[in-house]
């Protein structure tokens, strides 16, 4: 499995040498809002500020997508991920796809 310290949005790993690029690893999660959550969030919008119900939903979706990406990188034989990114798309009303992706690599300590 990729070491959490060896996952970066950069395209290099200071102190490591990338020996092999294994391709794109990705984790995809599709989430929908519940009726109760949508109602609660609607109430929060009346008062302004952070809509904590949606923030929590987004954080869970991103974490799940991140963990799925790590698992795919591990299955590909990678121990690190470079160029990691998130993307989110509303694919239907109230249904959002969260994608976490990066390049799975085999990295070794330099030096």
UniProtKB/Swiss-Prot annotation:
SUPFAM superfamilies: YbjQ-like. InterPro entries: UPF0145_dom_sf, UPF0145_YbjQ-like. Gene3D superfamilies: Hypothetical protein apc22750. Chain B. Belongs to the UPF0145 family. It comes from Burkholderia thailandensis (strain ATCC 700388 / DSM 13276 / CCUG 48851 / CIP 106301 / E264). Pfam families: YbjQ_1. This is UPF0145 protein BTH_I2656. The lineage of its organism: Bacteria, Pseudomonadati, Pseudomonadota, Betaproteobacteria, Burkholderiales.
